Amino acid sequence: MESYYLWFKSAHLISAICWMAGLLYLPRIYVYHTKAKIGSELDSTLQVMELKLLRFIMNPAMISTFIFGLINAHIYGFVALDTWFQFKMFAVLILVIFHGLLARWRKDFAKGKNVHSKKFYRIVNEIPAICMVIAVIMVIVKPFD
């Protein structure tokens, strides 16, 4: 299994990049969606875009990120007691919660019941970027080792 470690590590990183792309892009779509009139052609188009991004890119990318991450943890050795790993996992937990919120907000748009402003979506769009920076620094620098 160790001989495949770099392949699994690559798959984990590719999956995480795809997931992050969705986490960063979906709130931007929501910014535009706040400007669309309910029931308009733009509203319908954005709903399709949001659904496909979530179902066909973000959800599979999140799942594969976890699968390959667990495989890597198994090969590399369980490091859960290391402080850097706990910080990384906290950042990942925030990303998972954010992913769930994005899914809920998509449903709100689909029902015509969005209550958030474009400013709100612009601000929350920073959450995945901050979590990504934390996770990358923890994995590469391991500042608490």
From Swiss-Prot:
Q: Which reaction does it catalyse?
A: protoporphyrinogen IX + 3 A = protoporphyrin IX + 3 AH2
Where's it found, cell-wise?
Cell membrane
Q: Name one GO biological process term.
A: protoporphyrinogen IX biosynthetic process
Q: Which GO terms describe its cellular component?
A: plasma membrane
Q: What is its main location?
A: membrane
Q: How is the cofactor bound?
A: Binds 1 heme b (iron(II)-protoporphyrin IX) group per subunit.
Pfam family membership, one: UPF0093
Give the metabolic or biological pathway.
Porphyrin-containing compound metabolism; protoporphyrin-IX biosynthesis; protoporphyrin-IX from protoporphyrinogen-IX: step 1/1
User: Does Cytoplasm show up as a keyword for this record?
Assistant: no
Listed transmembrane segments:
6-26, 61-81, 83-103, 123-143
User: What is the role of this chain?
Assistant: Catalyzes the oxidation of protoporphyrinogen IX to protoporphyrin IX. Is involved in the biosynthesis of tetrapyrrole molecules like heme. Does not use oxygen or artificial electron acceptors such as menadione or benzoquinone.
Spell out the family assignment given in the record's similarity comment. Belongs to the HemJ family.
Under the subunit heading, UniProt states: Homodimer.
Spell out the protein name for this chain: Protoporphyrinogen IX oxidase
Origin species: Rickettsia prowazekii (strain Madrid E)
